[in-house]
Amino acid sequence: MPLAQLKEPWPLMELVPLDPENGQTSGEEAGLQPSKDEAILKEISITHHVKAGSEKADPSQFELLKVLGQGSFGKVFLVRKVTRPDSGHLYAMKVLKKATLKVRDRVRTKMERDILADVNHPFVVKLHYAFQTEGKLYLILDFLRGGDLFTRLSKEVMFTEEDVKFYLAELALGLDHLHSLGIIYRDLKPENILLDEEGHIKLTDFGLSKEAIDHEKKAYSFCGTVEYMAPEVVNRQGHTHSADWWSYGVLMGKDRKETMTLILKAKLGMPQFLSTEAQSLLRALFKRNPANRLGSGPDGAEEIKRHIFYSTIDWNKLYRREIKPPFKPAVAQPDDTFYFDTEFTSRTPRDSPGIPPSAGAHQLFRGFSFVATGLMEDDGKPRTTQAPLHSVVQQLHGKNLVFSDGYVVKETIGVGSYSVCKRCVHKATNMEYAVKVIDKSKRDPSEEIEILLRYGQHPNIITLKDVYDDGKHVYLVTELMRGGELLDKILRQKFFSEREASFVLHTISKTVEYLHSQGVVHRDLKPSNILYVDESGNPECLRICDFGFAKQLRAENGLLMTPCYTANFVAPEVLKRQGYDEGCDIWSLGILLYTMLAGYTPFANGPSDTPEEILTRIGSGKFTLSGGNWNTVSETAKDLVSKMLHVDPHQRLTAKQVLQHPWITQKDKLPQSQLSHQDLQLVKGAMAATYSALNSSKPTPQLKPIESSILAQRRVRKLPSTTL
């Protein structure tokens, strides 16, 4: 079932009440009485050892880039390591002032550091360093660029029960690992589940976790986020790992008071839009007696993994991260922070020395420092290789940034309807880039930016490096295409064969198939938007550029849709439109293929052809496959051209079918004889005329004053003179 029409992943719905479970009962007031055990605070001894030869980290080894967040425990910064062995690597640095931490908070901080140092799991955030100064504690963690799961699912995506199952399954593996170490998580909520750049989850924020010696030991403190608390936590009757499995299945209420009442009185219900398997799992998780709760038995998480709801999950593949996530966050360079609250990212990063705490506080944190052994070679010596140093990407954070402060603008590379492209040089690094300057009054670039952020890491899609906005224009800084346009390169070659054309089309079709599989259509795949990043002429160096007309498949409410949602819940007319747009992309590739093989364009003889003449030829669907180069071109090539240029867009091959065509799969059988071609400028002129004619066939309606309409003028003529 589709779920994303909800404002929150688990809002309170009209529910069918569950029968309260016999067993534990408690008055609501029980949650208000402090526990005797809660007042006992003990320092947690730290027994972790550091590999011989490792060096302790300190604040001077990290360059502050941005503020990512701020909470009751301190600030989180995006930082770059500036010393070996991992110089250039980006981390999230959690900084806590000792002087402002309560004693209880200090214990929690040490607890978080101990837990993270122990944990090594694909779905739990990794601790790389921990150290302290006189006034502060530092945790250096993975920098997870995808933001938190709650923000992503509630604000951006139409998702289904199948999609939610993926996240819950990864979460179950992460929790199971923590439980195997004797750790109760106790603060499980969507805000503490982050996404990496691929869309896999990572559990984070272990400040409320509690290590238990064995499964019999209970914790008593009143902690966690109330919406997700198990009844035994609210009632302070002692809780074990099973409290996490309650939180795992909880439905979030409208407000804290209402949620607390529901938890205490067991007035939980079951949303009827869920499948029977999902309802069965929730009923098994929502047992007020923790001993009866699924996951609390001797098999632990294995009970949950065996549940029928997860019958479609391959747990081994999931652990190896081989199952594709339903949603890929839009992230560009490794140091971007598009997915963090602008309230924090717009602040100037500043880490003050911190007021020294009381005399005994430093002793409380003894043994706090930690170095990840993964940063050392097997023999204990530091690694000699360095991570690549990335250029700083300045992002839009509600301010107008001056592009010329960071870059020197050079000559114009190209001019479009809504933008101009220029070469530019980054002042700090002297690196060359291209900048696309878009007139905001003529075009909204937000979709183009989002697509480039989400998919620009593909090897054959242009990479977005930086974004500026001065109010009137948006500046998109991308890698510089030094090799020029595809057709220029091909037609200037002294020798170009059919086999080489197959390699070129293979690379481009692979990229288009990737975009289409993600619900993205380019809609402007003319040859001038396919360029080489260098002058090698290698097909793998091709880049698809200019996503100004590109679209992502969205629902009527504007949200993106996961593949599962698209397959099950999208209206036929929406899919038909998407198929039409995909067909247009294939048609453009067909034009390119025809031109590479024939040496001239299929529907235009030259730049002097009128749009009407060109459109008539396109509409007829007729083009020649005989004479000239066609006498030596293979029959499989002619077959592919015919199927890509079919007059009906819904009967054209898909990008996937193009990749499966014998002309692509059996390149070694293709001729290697030289293909002749018309004059370069004639071919380019004819190609430009073709796309100009296509654009002219879609006139934009012009809105005029209502008084200028024929109906309004006729009414004025009929009015008596006294009313004028």
Curated annotation (Swiss-Prot):
PTM annotation, UniProt: Activated by phosphorylation at Ser-221 by PDPK1. Autophosphorylated on Ser-369, as part of the activation process. May be phosphorylated at Thr-348 and Ser-352 by MAPK1/ERK2 and MAPK3/ERK1.
Residues reported to bind ATP: 68-76, 94, 413-421, 436
Subcellular location: Nucleus; Cytoplasm
GO molecular function: ATP binding; DNA-binding transcription factor binding; kinase activity; magnesium ion binding; protein serine kinase activity; protein serine/threonine kinase activity; protein serine/threonine/tyrosine kinase activity
Catalytic activity: L-seryl-[protein] + ATP = O-phospho-L-seryl-[protein] + ADP + H(+); L-threonyl-[protein] + ATP = O-phospho-L-threonyl-[protein] + ADP + H(+)
GO biological process, one term: intracellular signal transduction
Regulation: Upon extracellular signal or mitogen stimulation, phosphorylated at Thr-562 in the C-terminal kinase domain (CTKD) by MAPK1/ERK2 and MAPK3/ERK1. The activated CTKD then autophosphorylates Ser-369, allowing binding of PDPK1, which in turn phosphorylates Ser-221 in the N-terminal kinase domain (NTDK) leading to the full activation of the protein and subsequent phosphorylation of the substrates by the NTKD.
Record-linked Pfam families: Pkinase, Pkinase_C
Residue intervals of the Protein kinase domain: 62-310, 407-664
Highest rank taxon of the organism: Eukaryota
The UniProt record lists the keyword ATP-binding: yes
Cofactor section: Mg(2+)
UniProt KW keywords: ATP-binding, Cytoplasm, Kinase, Nucleotide-binding, Nucleus, Phosphoprotein, Repeat, Serine/threonine-protein kinase, Transferase
Listed EC numbers: 2.7.11.1
One cellular component (GO) term of this entry: nucleus
Expression sites (tissue/organ): Intestine, thymus, and lung.
InterPro entries, A to Z: AGC-kinase_C (IPR000961), Kinase-like_dom_sf (IPR011009), Pkinase_C (IPR017892), Prot_kinase_dom (IPR000719), Protein_kinase_ATP_BS (IPR017441), Ribosomal_S6_kinase_II (IPR016239), RSK_N (IPR041906), Ser/Thr_kinase_AS (IPR008271)
Residues with Phosphothreonine modification: 348, 562
Residues with Phosphoserine modification: 54, 221, 296, 352, 358, 369, 721
Active-site feature positions: 187, 524
Domain AGC-kinase C-terminal: 311-380
Subunit structure: Forms a complex with either MAPK1/ERK2 or MAPK3/ERK1 in quiescent cells. Transiently dissociates following mitogenic stimulation. Interacts with ETV1/ER81 and FGFR1.
PANTHER family, A to Z: RIBOSOMAL PROTEIN S6 KINASE (PTHR24351)
Function: Serine/threonine-protein kinase that acts downstream of ERK (MAPK1/ERK2 and MAPK3/ERK1) signaling and mediates mitogenic and stress-induced activation of the transcription factors CREB1, ETV1/ER81 and NR4A1/NUR77, regulates translation through RPS6 and EIF4B phosphorylation, and mediates cellular proliferation, survival, and differentiation by modulating mTOR signaling and repressing pro-apoptotic function of BAD and DAPK1. In fibroblast, is required for EGF-stimulated phosphorylation of CREB1, which results in the subsequent transcriptional activation of several immediate-early genes.
Annotated family: Belongs to the protein kinase superfamily. AGC Ser/Thr protein kinase family. S6 kinase subfamily.
Protein name as annotated: Ribosomal protein S6 kinase alpha-1
Organism: Mus musculus
Name of the gene this protein is made from: Rps6ka1
